[in-house]
A protein has these predicted regions:
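Post-cleavage N-terminal segment of exported redox proteins
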Residues: 27-31, 40-84, 168, 179, ...
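Electron-transfer interface patches adjacent to heme c in soluble/periplasmic c-type cytochromes
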Residues: 31-32, 80-92, 236, 240-257, ...
Length: 953
């Protein structure tokens, strides 16, 4: 043998023998197996001998590579300029011209067009994954005007179910799942956003080149677009071990990058790029150098969780309205400060008795402290307690004490510093902060009686972290995420005062219970609290809490020989700025401002799983870094055998000139934290003139053809290389790829183009001639009936029975009783949905270009015996119009139209009528309370189990 491709050439007897052995091994027959013909055995032996000799004489020939021998395979050639043949068909459709030319060579022709019911049902399942409604079918059958078929297609392409249907095809290719796989199979919160992106992109008919750009580098193309960031979930959808020792970090990282590259190659280029990891590709012109230089694209790409506002425009509108209202409240407070506050301040100064600094605060008798989370309290001898022991994430302190005072009007909570607290306190958080989410006060007679809650008003504090969500006012609402905090005033005494809306008056004394709830942030509890009460209203803070400048001014005007008139204008302004916090009118205006500020619209942040650079990596149980700073060439794929640093390039066979990768290299803007390598890869993949764009177009066009015609023009959609199958109609494939590019890479026009052809619309009638000449239908001489995929089967049953929930997008579920479309099931690799597996849904481990379509007993058994199917049938029976007893024919007609999109045949009508009558009688005889309902359920369940429901002609 010469050259670099190794082939085993066996005789026809060899393949006949292999076929015989395969059929024998795969059969379930119990009859004795006939002996293998002797001449076949002899020829089989000679074939093996010849093959071994050929391999031995091949010497040390190297695998094919760009450097040794240029490969001229069809996938790597530019798109051919093709003119559609003008065949003998009455149709002028270009697709039919290509198909008819091949059929003519074989002495065949297209089948006649299928009937309208079959066509609409076929198209509805193809485009929507659901059957057409009886109303839609009737409207189509009655629309005899020119263009009826085109209009029907346009209506379906515009429906939101289209994206759900075709997203499922792409998610197979993208090996999409929402867990990491392996033995722990941890969930990936936010991964479902990638699924939602695919649905939205397909419904919006996003150009396919942009669809590819965003999946590879959405964060580099449009870093502020949430949808573009969601799209990058494509790269991170693969399996990943989440328990990684230090010795495994490097190998695991190369595995993760290989998954990204291999999936990109299979899904977008139809090439098994990953086969060049350990050596030059044995069949395709891909070298290990190509592999590692392309692999370096993903050197610093990591999975990351980002919290994003998915509706920024709505948030901006809400903020605009909020700021307008807030400005009005601030203006009202400013007007009060200018027109009213000065006179009230002067009256306070003239009164004189309001100058005293310290309120008459009383420490309650025998206080008792309790911690819900189990912390302990140590008395400090000054009425305060030091909180010690367990510092749980969240806690609630309960303070109970008594007083003989019969009239209480205010309560003061002090948060004292202490050397034992972090940063000196006053909180127990690592930085010394606190977060009081709610304060509640209850009172009851000291001698016993009914306890009631006191309504707290006019909150004020020595210091607040802000005047909104972290103010003392926010400790009086029911939002546990907001509350009093004091950052950065650590290591100092802080205090808060609240007044009682109505004085608490109990002649025999009062028992008070105070609850302090801490849920603003983890471990943000007060470290040394002290509580006191007073009978004064709007009492000021004691001297220690009053700023030094204010204490100085108050002391001066209180000293003999001085009066308020001795204050300068600036001193009066300083004093009034402090005093106004005790003025009821100003506090009311300020409270309106602050309460409104608490309601400032916040973006509804949603966590999405994305892949990118410069973001915090999603942490795994890894004893090492999240990525490696460089990608190396690895000898035989071993991370222990590095052979130099790999710099980014692409597949040489898909570049017009060697080492010309610089034309696609994109330089990120200054300050960007991403490398631009993934955007460079995306630009090369979609470049139809110099890069891989022509192959990208061929691959996606082939995928569309595959799902409309049952098999692709290339039957190995993930492998266009030597090991794949060549296209049955290469000129048609190139012409369709060119049409896609000329049409701006939009897929919906291509769907329409394919489905308006006579090739698509032909019937599935078979003939002996076609079965003999075109047994596998590679010439597309007929339409081949096909079973629906697992998701479409379940969705169809839900739709027929009226149980389908059309809600789109959002988190999925593992609950099999969910009535949403099957694409919204959570894809957990260790907990796949059984019904989908029964009908051949693949495991999402690697890119899947095709699904098997098996026929096994559990499928029929599931339809007949599954409780959910029975429940759906019962639901349908309760909703179906008409009476199966008094109007059986009408009722049966409606049931057949809903389930099979046709009326029953005479024999079916007669059999169904008889079945209903017999079942009603059986249930009535057996004492069933609803014999008609039960009999109807039985018949409808039988209809759901028909092959006709899950097969499409």
């Amino acid at each position: 043998m010469t050259g670099s491709l190794h082939y085993l050439r066996f005789s026809s007897a060899f393949f006949a023998l292999l076929g015989f052995l395969g059929a024998t091994i795969g059969s379930a027959a119990t009859e004795p197996v006939p002996p293998v013909p002797a001449d076949h055995v002899q020829r089989f032996g000679r074939g093996l001998k010849d093959a071994s000799i050929a391999l031995e004489t091949s010497g040390n020939s190297k695998p094919i590579s760009k450097s040794s021998k240029p490969f001229s395979g069809w996938p790597f050639q530019p798109l051919a300029t093709v003119t559609p043949p003008s065949g003998s068909l009455p149709t002028s459709h270009p697709v039919d011209g290509f198909i008819a030319a091949r059929l003519t060579e074989k002495g065949l022709s297209l089948n006649p067009e299928a009937d309208r019911r079959t066509l609409l049902r076929r198209a509805s399942f193809d485009l929507l994954g659901l059957p057409p409604s009886p109303e839609a079918l009737e409207a189509f059958e009655q629309d005899t005007a020119i263009g009826a078929w085109d209009r029907a297609l346009d209506r379906m392409l515009a429906q939101p179910q289209h994206g759900e249907r075709w997203a499922r095809h792409w998610l197979d290719v993208a090996r999409f799942a929402e867990s990491s796989g392996f033995e722990h199979d941890y969930d990936r919160p936010g991964a479902y956003h990638y699924r939602d992106f695919v649905i939205k992109a397909l419904n919006a008919d996003m150009p396919f080149d942009q669809f590819v750009h965003w999946q590879l580098a959405g964060d580099e193309f449009e870093p502020e677009n949430p949808l573009a960031l969601m799209a990058t979930g494509f790269l991170g959808a693969g399996v990943f071990p989440t328990q990684i020792t230090a010795n495994e970090v490097e190998r695991t990282r190369y595995d993760a990058m290989d998954d990204m590259l291999s999936t990109t190659g299979s899904a977008m280029l139809g090439l098994t790029v990953g086969c060049a990891r350990c050596h030059d590709h044995k069949f395709d012109p891909i070298t290990t150098q190509d592999y590692y230089r392309m692999l370096s694209t993903f050197t610093t790409t990591v999975r990351s969780l980002r919290s994003l506002d998915l509706n920024p425009e709505q948030t901006q509108q809400q903020l605009k309205a909020f700021e307008l209202e807030q400005a009005g409240l601030v203006a009202a407070r400013t007007l009060y400060e200018k027109k009213i506050l000065p006179d009230r301040f002067e009256a306070w100064l003239r009164a004189g008795d309001g100058w005293k600094v310290k309120a008459d605060w009383e420490l309650l008798e025998s206080p008792e402290w309790k911690s819900k989370a189990g912390a302990s309290f140590r008395s400090m001898g000054d009425g305060s307690v030091l909180v010690e022991g367990k510092n749980a994430d969240y806690d609630t302190y309960t303070f109970t004490a008594e007083t003989s005072t019969a009239d209480l009007r205010s309560l003061r909570l002090e948060a004292l510093p202490d050397p034992s607290l972090p940063q000196g306190g006053p909180g127990r958080a690592d930085n010394g902060n606190l977060g009081l989410s709610r304060i509640r006060v209850f009172a009851e007679p000291r001698s016993g009686g009914i306890r009631h809650e006191i309504h707290l008003v006019r909150p004020r504090a020595t210091f607040e972290q802000n005047h909104g969500s972290l103010s003392i006012a926010s400790s009086l609402d029911d939002d546990f995420h907001t509350g009093w905090a004091v950052d950065p005033k650590f290591g100092t005494r802080q205090a808060a005062i609240v007044d009682f809306e109505t004085p608490v008056q109990m002649p025999g004394g009062i028992r008070l219970t105070v609850e302090l709830e801490f849920q603003v942030n983890v471990r943000h509890h007060i470290g040394r609290p002290r509580i006191s009460v007073t009978s004064q209203t709007a009492a000021p803070f004691d001297p220690e809490s009053v700023p030094a400048e204010i204490r100085r001014l108050l002391s001066r005007i209180n000293s003999p020989g001085n009066s308020p008139e001795s204050l300068s204008s600036s001193e009066r302004a300083t004093l009034m700025s402090w005093w106004k916090t005790s003025d009821e009118g100003w506090r009311a205006a300020q409270q309106r401002v602050e309460l409104h500020a608490k309601n400032r619209p916040k973006p509804a942040l949603t966590s999405i799983l994305m892949c990118g650079e410069g973001y915090p990596a999603l942490r795994m149980h890894t004893q090492g870094g999240d990525f490696l700073p460089e990608t190396h060439f690895l000898h035989r794929g071993s991370a222990d055998q590095k052979r130099g640093v790999a710099t980014q390039s692409f597949l040489q066979v898909l570049m017009k000139s060697a080492d010309s990768e610089s034309q696609w290299h994109w330089q990120p803007p200054a300050g960007a934290e991403y490398s631009g390598r993934r955007r460079s890869l995306a630009l090369w993949i979609t470049d139809t003139r110099e890069g891989a764009g022509h192959l990208l177009a061929r691959v996606i066009v082939n995928r569309l053809w595959q799902h409309h015609f049952g098999q692709g023009l290339v039957t190995t959609p993930n492998d266009f290389g030597v090991q794949g199958t060549p296209p049955s109609h290469p000129e048609l494939l190139d012409w369709l790829a060119s049409e896609l590019i000329r049409g701006g890479w939009r897929l919906k026009p291509l769907h329409r183009l394919l489905m308006t052809s006579q090739t698509y619309r032909q019937s599935s009638t078979e003939s002996e001639l076609k079965l003999r000449i075109d047994p596998s239908n590679r010439c597309f001489s007929r339409h081949v009936p096909a079973r629906l995929e697992a998701e479409a089967i379940r969705d169809t049953l839900l739709w027929i029975t009226g149980a389908l929930d059309p809600t789109q997008f959002g988190p999925g579920t593992l609950d099999e009783s969910s009535r949403r479309r099957s694409i919204y099931f959570t894809v957990k690799r260790s907990q796949l949905i059984p019904i989908l597996q029964v009908f051949d849904s693949p495991e999402p481990l690697v890119s899947q270009g095709t699904r098997p379509a098996t026929t096994v007993a559990p499928q029929a058994l599931w339809l007949l015996n599954n409780p959910q199917v029975r429940e759906w049938a019962s639901r349908w029976a309760s909703q179906e119009g008409g009476n199966p007893r008094s109007e059986p024919d009408l009722w049966i007609h409606r049931a057949y139209q809903r389930a099979l999109q046709r009326l029953p045949r005479d024999t079916e009508l007669k059999a169904s009528r008889l079945f209903l009558a017999q079942q009603m009688e059986r249930y009535r005889t057996g004492g069933t309370s609803q014999p008609e309902r039960m009999a109807a359920t039985d018949l409808l369940h039988a209809l759901l189990s028909l092959n006709e429901v899950i097969y499409v002609d």
